[in-house]
A protein has these predicted regions:
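Conserved beta-strand
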Residues: 6-9, 16-26, 33, 57
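Conserved ABC transporter NBD signature motif
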Residues: 25, 57-68, 72-73
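Catalytic Walker B motif of ABC-type/P-loop ATPase nucleotide-binding domains
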Residues: 150-154, 159
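Helix-to-loop junction immediately C-terminal to a conserved catalytic motif
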Residues: 49
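Walker A (P-loop) phosphate-binding loop of ABC-type ATPase nucleotide-binding domains
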Residues: 35-40
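C-terminal coupling/interaction segments
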Residues: 237-278
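ABC-family P-loop ATPase nucleotide-binding domains
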Residues: 75, 79-137
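ABC transporter nucleotide-binding domain
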Residues: 167-251
Length: 278
């Protein structure tokens, strides 16, 4: 059974439309949710949290309709975002005491375990925490009510490379424990390291929803000289641009099979940047 199933989700605004968004999340997987600003990521996440009311479509968590089981479902969901500002002068233990009553499955033993694991001092205030430690505290709150699904909205934004890598290790460890993660981010290199699956949204439409390996295998990066960039080849290229030694472009793997040219595998950033300019 899927942890989350979204079917034909639509939301209309004056200048933007979320258009029949559909995808599924399988248990214990990390799914990267990518797309440029304004593509529909935030609207989708807010719809999942019932902060935005879609015009049509269906959202099913753990095999149950969201509309009819919202309270029960939210007991199993944790939301973590980068840049969350808690009461800056309140001690962490006070914030925890305020949060605890909202969850019927609050597990004090788990709370203490993750506070120790993440080396957090509950006598400190958010003002005394780094950005990375604030994200870890958000994770503690989510995991202390035994969340089975974590929805992450730019959790590594603004963090230094070491802190980001530390969090990615944590996410992968949680996935190994069976927790499902939906990871919305602009930092595609993070997803290269940890994602099992990718959802790519552009202009309110899902253009890809597949496993990461299959998504990357669909494209190659070509490095071309002026002489190699023929008019016929140009028709097959995606996001061709001038490079240090000639031209660089993306090409679909199916179009590259008979080409005797220098090419390499593509990472997420190479693919998304060029697809956005297509």
């Amino acid at each position: 059974m899927s942890v989350l199933s979204v079917r034909d989700l639509c939301k209309k605004y004056d200048q933007f439309e979320l258009n029949k968004v559909s995808f599924e999340l399988e248990p214990g997987t990390i799914t990267g949710f990518i797309g440029r600003n304004g593509a529909g990521k935030t609207t989708t996440l807010k719809s999942l949290l019932n902060l935005v009311h879609p015009n049509s479509g269906e959202i099913v968590f753990f095999g149950k309709s969201y509309k009819e089981n919202e309270f029960e479902i939210k007991q199993k969901i944790g939301f973590v975002a980068g840049g969350i500002d808690y009461y800056p002068k309140k001690k962490i233990k006070t914030i925890t005491s305020t949060t605890r009553p909202f969850y019927k499955n609050w597990d004090e033993k788990a709370y203490k375990h993750y506070m120790d694991l993440f080396d957090l001092d509950e006598n400190k205030t958010p003002d005394e925490l780094s950005a990375g430690m604030k994200v870890k505290y958000s994770l503690v709150l989510a995991l202390s009510h035994n969340a089975e699904l974590l929805i992450l909205d730019e959790p590594t934004s603004g963090l230094d490379p070491v802190s980001r890598d530390d969090l990615l290790d944590i996410f992968m460890g949680l996935s190994d424990e069976g927790i499902t993660i939906l990871f919305s981010t602009h930092i595609t290199s993070d997803l290269d390291k940890c994602a099992d699956n990718i959802i790519y949204i552009k202009n309110g439409k899902i253009l890809a929803s597949t496993d990461l390996t299959s998504f990357l295998a669909q494209y190659k990066v070509l490095e071309l000289t002026d002489e190699e960039l023929t008019d016929e080849l140009k028709t097959k290229l995606i996001g061709c641009k001038k490079s240090k030694h000639g031209f660089s472009a993306l090409i679909r793997a199916t179009d590259s099979e008979k080409l005797d040219l220098a090419m390499s595998g593509a990472d997420l950033e190479s693919i998304v940047v060029r697809l956005e300019k297509e």
